[in-house]
Every structure is written in structure tokens, then in C-alpha cells.
């Protein structure tokens, strides 16, 4: 009898354990479903943009045969890049779901203070392309630079964005000391690529604000206080998203050359040719996405390309 009762008690305990496990599974499922519902409500434009960006990339890659002789791309290169695109999309979706609270917490502590900060003013977003050498600073404009643009002797930047530690190691310490108290730095954290993100010790040394950005494709959205900053293989898009937050009347694009000609300081781009052309293709898609985004959500902000090369004809062009 005792053995029978023991078996009954053991069975009861097992049933409770199973029930608890089922409850835990249901709780996880409920959490995932709620996260997906929140994303569906809050990020429809982002996911539609991601899908359009990837489809656009696929279309462009399928039409690439006519360009193969010029840039020496092979079918294997194209297939590899398409696989990389699919993997990046899945990785970004994962990080967006499971790091959403971290993104919101950080961005809500950083960006609200800058909303409408430069309303009605002119902003120059400064890249590092060769045409930066020709730029004559626009009087009275707020200057937002990226990467090593701060090394241009004629510039006095008000803001500086850096997010790729691999390419910035050679000048990050100089950036930390640049115009201290006058130029606010923003050092990015790349979700899924922490090994190339700016280390915390450098951000502390620069008194820099942190922000999150995704790898590769990450479209623009109006609410950067709750979402990652955009990225199309260029930090310029993060700087542009910040510029939009401040509500200027006009944004000048300086040194945003979007080609393989290297940098304003004479340094060349040492990427493999196939990878470079792939990166430029993503970058150009980003500019087209930005153009559509601006036309829909910020039609009152004028975008002007200064001494344009790769962006010629996309926005209003001026030459100095």
C-alpha cells in the first residue's frame, strides 16, 4: 500500500512539474507574441523598408551581369553577398526583438534633449570623401561630422559621430580630445558586432553619448528615441537621423561622395574590389531610401548636396 501511495505522490509531483514547464513555455510564447505585436504596431515602416531594401538589393544583384567585366565580380561574389544580406536581416530582427528594451532605455536617456534643438537653422552633415577638401564652411551652419572629418583644418564641428572602432583606432584618441566642451561626441554600439564597436573606455574618455545601430541594412524611422539609428554601410546615416531630430530648415551634404575614390586626406579604400562595390551599392540604396523618407516625412526640410559626385542629381546640387 505504501509503495502504491508513493507512486501516486511521485506521479502528482511529476504532473506539477510538467504543468509548471507548460506554464513557462506558455509564458515565453506570450512574451514573444506580445513583442511581435508591439513591433507590428510600432515598426511597420521599418520592416517594410527592410523588405524593400533587400528586394532592391536582390534586383540589383540579378542585373549585375552587365557590370561584371568592369568590377570583376563573379557569380560566387554575388551569391555570397546575397547570403550575407539574408543573414544580416535575420540577425537584425533577432537583435531588435531581444534588445529592444536596452535600445529604448539608452536612446530615451540621450536624444530627447536634442529634439528641435536647431529648429529653423542650417546643418551641414560632413562625410570624409575627397570633395571635403573643396568645402568652404557655410557661415552660421551647425556642423555634424563623422569619423575623421574633424581633422579637416577648416572645420569646427559641433557634433561628431563615430561607430567603427577598427577604422577609427588611429585617430580615436585625437577625437576624444577634439574641441572638448564645444563638440558633443556620439560613439555607436553596433548590435551583433560588438567587436568593432567603440569601447566604453573611449566613450568615457570623450564624454560621448552612446547609441545603438544595426549591422548593414537598418532603415530610417521618425522615432530614434525608441529605435536604432539607420545604417546602410555608412555612419553618415546615423548623423542624418540625428540632424532630422533637431528640426533644421536645410541640411547640406558635404563630403558624401559615395564612390571608391578614397578620403579627403588622400588615404585610399583598401577593401577588396568586390566587397567595395557591394558596400557602395548598399550605400547608394541608403541614399535613395533617405530621399523617399525625407519626401514623405520631412518635406519642409531642404536637402542640398555640396560639390556632389555619387549623389549628383538626387537632391539639390550646389558647387563651391
List PLM regions with ranges.
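Metal-ion/cofactor- or nucleotide/acyl-coenzyme-handling active-site neighborhoods
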Residues: 73-320
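Boundary detector for helix-to-coil junctions that initiate low-complexity/charged tails
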Residues: 1-90
Amino acid at each position: 500500500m505504501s509503495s502504491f501511495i508513493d507512486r501516486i505522490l511521485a506521479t502528482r509531483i511529476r504532473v506539477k512539474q510538467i504543468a509548471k514547464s507548460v506554464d513557462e513555455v506558455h509564458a515565453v510564447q506570450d512574451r514573444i507574441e506580445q513583442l511581435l505585436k508591439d513591433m507590428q504596431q510600432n515598426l511597420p515602416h521599418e520592416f517594410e523598408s527592410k523588405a524593400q531594401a533587400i528586394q532592391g538589393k536582390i534586383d540589383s544583384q540579378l542585373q549585375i551581369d552587365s557590370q561584371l567585366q568592369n568590377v570583376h565580380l563573379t557569380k560566387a561574389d554575388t551569391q555570397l553577398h546575397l547570403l550575407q544580406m539574408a543573414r544580416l536581416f535575420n540577425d537584425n530582427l533577432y537583435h531588435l526583438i531581444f534588445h529592444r528594451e536596452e535600445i529604448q532605455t539608452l536612446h530615451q536617456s540621450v536624444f530627447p534633449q536634442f529634439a528641435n534643438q536647431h529648429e529653423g537653422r542650417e546643418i551641414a552633415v560632413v562625410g570624409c570623401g575627397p570633395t571635403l577638401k573643396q568645402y568652404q564652411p557655410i557661415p552660421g551652419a551647425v556642423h555634424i561630422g563623422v569619423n575623421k572629418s574633424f581633422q579637416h583644418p577648416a572645420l569646427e564641428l559641433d557634433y561628431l559621430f563615430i561607430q567603427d572602432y577598427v577604422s577609427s583606432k588611429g585617430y580615436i584618441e585625437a577625437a576624444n580630445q577634439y574641441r572638448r566642451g564645444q563638440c558633443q561626441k556620439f560613439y555607436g554600439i553596433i548590435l551583433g558586432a560588438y567587436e568593432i564597436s567603440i569601447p566604453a573606455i573611449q566613450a568615457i574618455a570623450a564624454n560621448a553619448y552612446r547609441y545603438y545601430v544595426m549591422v548593414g541594412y537598418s532603415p530610417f524611422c521618425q522615432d530614434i528615441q525608441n529605435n536604432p539609428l539607420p545604417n546602410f554601410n555608412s555612419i553618415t546615416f546615423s548623423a542624418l537621423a540625428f540632424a532630422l531630430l533637431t528640426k533644421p530648415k536645410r541640411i547640406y551634404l558635404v563630403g558624401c561622395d559615395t564612390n571608391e575614390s578614397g578620403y579627403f586626406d588622400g588615404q585610399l579604400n583598401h577593401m577588396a574590389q568586390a566587397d567595395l562595390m557591394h558596400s557602395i551599392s548598399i550605400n547608394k540604396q541608403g541614399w535613395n531610401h533617405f530621399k523617399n523618407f525625407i519626401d514623405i516625412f520631412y518635406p519642409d526640410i531642404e536637402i542640398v548636396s555640396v560639390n556632389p559626385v555619387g549623389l549628383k542629381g538626387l537632391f539639390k546640387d550646389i558647387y563651391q
